[in-house]
Structures are given as C-alpha cells and as structure tokens.
A protein has these predicted regions:
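Ligand-binding clefts/hinges and TM-proximal coupling segments of bilobed small-molecule sensing domains
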Residues: 66-78, 215-236, 308-343
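C-terminal region of N-terminal signal peptides and the immediate post-cleavage residues
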Residues: 26-49
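Extracytoplasmic small-molecule ligand-binding "clamshell" domains
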Residues: 54-161
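Periplasmic-binding protein-like
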Residues: 46-51, 182-190, 265, 269-305, ...
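Bilobed "Venus flytrap"/periplasmic-binding protein-like clamshell domains
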Residues: 103, 115-132, 165-168, 184-241, ...
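Acidic, polar ligand-binding/catalytic clefts
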Residues: 34, 137-201
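A ligand-binding cleft/hinge motif common to bilobed small-molecule-binding domains
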Residues: 148, 164-173, 221, 247-283
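Short beta-strand-to-loop elements that line the ligand-binding cleft
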Residues: 136-145, 231-241, 278
Length: 343
C-alpha cells in the first residue's frame, strides 16, 4: 500500500477520515500477514519432504484449478474465426506456435521427408485446423521458445499456442486458455548416478536448470523463498527453451533439471543416462492458449476437444506417449473439463 501517494491525493477532513481507515487497514494487514503465510512445522523444514500443493492468488484463483475458468464449448463463429477464414490463397491457414524440439510432443522427425513436425501436440493442432478450415494440413507452424509463448499471442504473431503450456492464474491475466487436454506435474530429472532423490533436501548445494518463464522456475523461486526448498539450491541457470536444460545436464553444467514430468519422461527416453527422481510435486494441466478477447476461438477449440477426447486423444497418446508415461498411468486418460458457470 502506497500511503504517501494516498495522502497527497486526499484533502480536507474527509481525506483525513479516509486516511485513518486506510492506515487501520494497513495495520491489520501487517498484523495478520504472519498468520496467513505461516506454514506447518513439517513443511517449514527446508527441503525435508517433497513439496506438494498449489499456490493461491489474490483473486481467489488456484493454479491447479485455473482451468475451470475456461468458457463452455460452442461451434458458433465469431470475429476471430471469421478473420482466420477470411485469409486467402496460401495464407489461408491456422497460425500456431509450437515446439520443434520436444521429443514426442512437438519435434522434427529426421526420418521423414522434410523432417516433418510430429508429436502429441502436433496431432491436436491438425485436428483443430481440420475443424476450423476443413483441412488438417492448413497450418502454418511457428517455432516459439518457451519464454516467448505469451508474447507471441499478445503480439498477434500466432492465432494460438499448442506447446505443453500449463494453465495458471498468472497466465490467465495475459491470455485465454482452452479446457485442459493433458494432466501432468513438475518432476526432477538428474543423472542416474546422481545422489539427488527428488524435490527434497538432496537439492541443497545443487545447480538446477529451468526454462525462463516456466511454471517450474516460478515454483522453485517461491519455494526457496518460503523455506520449502534448501536456500543453497542454485536456480541461476535459465534457458529460453526447456530442451536446452537437458543439454546443460549432459555437459555437466547443472546437476538437475526441473520441468513437467511428461516432458522429462520424453527426455529420459532420449538419454538413458538420466532419469526421473522422485514423484511429481505439483498438479498441472496443459491448455491451448489464445488471445484474451478471442472468446469465439476458445469456445470453438473447446468444442473440438469434446470430440477429440472421445475420438483421437487416446490414439495419439498411445502413439507418442505411452512408451514413456505408461499405458495405465494417471496421465494416460484425458482430464475432464470444467467450465465457467453461465458460459
């Protein structure tokens, strides 16, 4: 609270009265703050146990439940979809930001003609393009680094981003999300010979790599600051693309990587010298990200997802992810959608 600014803006006895109220509220906030932030004794033991749970925001949004804020499905076109359909000739395509380096999610397969983009996310993009433009190949793919996903949407460089992007309260302030299409959680990836056992005290004095702008980085910074992660854990290594962390790990420049377990499992499949350490310590959901004012496009994608969950999702999972995540794991079924009331 900026008391000096409030004081300069107020004049007269009425201003004095309001200032008294503001000061009283500020005092109450300070007195109550330690109670709102106090953690249980066992949770305050820095890194002694795996950290679970979610982070609530001031507006009441909880990250693990943020996907419930998405609007309900609809097949009706609107200004966003009309603009996409109005593109002519070779430009009549859905412009989608994707990854081209995440094995089995969005990557260029060197064994195909022209090193075609393939993966779980790519399958979903083709389904959305088919529904909107009548052609699954009517897509212009744009490779977007992890830390450029939101700017690419806000700047209008892409119509949407389908790139293992977690739905969070903070991101909902900048973009709109579809209903979730995948459930995962943060995990630790480290060399098989490493003494690191998971998201716990074994990360003390260890250098951890994360992607800039990722939910992993935000979680680690918050937990270290709150005493739920060893204070000596080094979080200074951040990279534009999540896959760069695997390279740093292979070169011995970092001791561990923290990222979505679904991505970490695919990386472990690429390199048998690394493995997942410990269980997931968060619950997260991937969604298709779009502009905040693109309500018609969000609803249209949600309608696509309704059909995709019933016809297509499981086939894509079995093709790309079952080998690394398992056929009967918690990730092996699509998450159930929940929508805003009255939407």
């Amino acid at each position: 609270m900026d008391v000096s600014r409030a004081r300069s803006a107020l004049r007269g006895w009425g201003g004095v009265a309001v200032m008294a109220v503001l000061c009283a509220l500020a005092l109450a906030f300070v007195l109550l703050l330690p109670y709102t932030q106090q953690a249980p004794d066992d949770a305050r033991q820095a890194g002694q146990k795996a950290v679970t749970g979610t982070q609530a925001r001031a507006d009441g949004c909880v990250d693990a439940e943020a996907h419930e804020r998405t609007p309900a499905p609809s097949g009706a076109d609107g200004p966003t979809i009309d603009a996409i359909k109005a593109r002519t000739g070779a430009k009549r395509k859905l412009i989608v930001g994707v990854d081209q380096n995440s094995y089995r999610w969005g990557y260029r397969n060197p064994n195909t003609d022209g090193a075609q983009l393939e993966g779980f996310d790519i399958d979903l993009v083709h389904r959305i393009a088919e529904d909107i433009l009548g052609d699954p190949d009517a897509v212009q793919f744009k490779a977007i680094p992890t830390n450029q996903r939101i700017p690419a949407i806000e700047d209008g460089r892409v119509d949407m981003v389908v790139r293992t992007m977690t739905i969070t309260c903070g991101r909902l302030e900048h973009v709109a999300f579809s209903a979730p299409y995948f459930k995962t959680g943060q995990q630790v990836l480290a060399p098989t010979s490493s003494p690191i056992t998971g998201y716990d005290a074994s990360l003390a004095h260890k250098k951890v790599c994360t992607a800039a702008g990722s939910t992993a980085l935000a979680k680690l910074e918050a937990d270290r600051k709150g005493g739920r992660l060893p204070a000596t854990t080094d979080l200074s290594t951040t990279v534009p693309n999540q896959l760069d962390c695997l390279v740093r790990l292979q070169l011995g420049e970092v001791d561990a990587v923290v990222t979505d377990g679904a991505l970490a499992a695919s990386q472990a499949a690429q390199d048998p010298t690394v493995e997942l350490k410990g269980a997931p310590f968060t619950t997260e959901y991937y969604g298709v990200a779009m502009k905040k004012d693109a309500g018609d496009l969000v609803r249209r994608v949600n309608r696509v997802l309704v059909d995709y969950r019933a016809h297509g999702w499981q086939t894509s999972y079995d093709d790309w992810l079952s080998a690394t995540l398992g056929k009967d794991s918690a990730a092996s079924k699509p998450p159930a959608p929940q929508y805003q009331r009255g939407s």
